[in-house]
Amino acid sequence: MERNEVAPGMLLVAAPDMASEDFERSIVLIIEHSPATTFGVNISSRSDVAVANVLPEWVDLTSKPQALYIGGPLSQQAVVGLGVTKPGVDIENSTSFNKLANRLVHVDLRSAPEDVADDLEGMRFFAGYAEWAPGQLNEEIEQGDWFVTPALPSDIIAPGRVDIWGDVMRRQAMPLPLYSTFPSDPSDN
C-alpha cells in the first residue's frame, strides 16, 4: 500500500493490532511536524468533562457532544482548540487560526470567542497531546502501528455516536476497510 507523508492536517490511524493501549483505535490529527518534533491530538477519545466546566466562554462554538476530548498523555492541563471554518473564510490572513488542511484549523485560544464565531462551523477542545521524538513516528509507521491519511472536516466535529476510527478505516484502500468493524477486544468478536 502506498504511504502518505506525515504533515499537519494528516491523520495517524492506529492499526487494528496496535500494542499500545494508550492509542488503541485512536485517530491522531497532526498539528505540527518538523525535523525536531511531531505532535498532534487524539480526536477519538472523549472524556466525561463538559467544555462548560473548563472553557465556558467557548461552549457556544463547541460541536456536540460538548465534551472535552483527551488529546494525549502529555500536558493534560494544556488545552488545544481545533476548528472547522465555514467555506470561504480567509484562513491565511487570520491571526486566530493556523491552517492544518483545507478548512481545518488550530485555533489560538487567546482570541476572544466572539472574534472567531462568524468564521467557524464548529470546534473541539483537547486536553493534552501526543508527541514523537525525531525518527520515532517514522519507526512506528514502518512497524505498521500507524496508517497516514488526510483528515476531513467531519472527522473533527463528528457527532458523539460516530465511530471515527471505523469511518476513517472505511475510507482507505483495501484491505483496511475490512478492519473497520474490528472490536477493541477481539474476544468480543
Curated annotation (Swiss-Prot):
Gene3D superfamilies: VC0467-like
Transmembrane segments: none
Coiled-coil regions listed in the entry: none
Any matching Pfam family: DUF179
Domain of life: Bacteria
SUPFAM superfamilies: VC0467-like
Cellular compartments per GO CC: cytosol
Record-linked PANTHER family: UNCHARACTERIZED PROTEIN YQGE (PTHR30327), UPF0301 PROTEIN YQGE (PTHR30327:SF1)
UniProt-listed HAMAP family: UPF0301 (MF_00758)
Family in the record: Belongs to the UPF0301 (AlgH) family.
NCBIfam families recorded: PRK00228.2-4
Protein name: UPF0301 protein Cgl3084/cg3414
Organism expressing this protein natively: Corynebacterium glutamicum (strain ATCC 13032 / DSM 20300 / JCM 1318 / BCRC 11384 / CCUG 27702 / LMG 3730 / NBRC 12168 / NCIMB 10025 / NRRL B-2784 / 534)
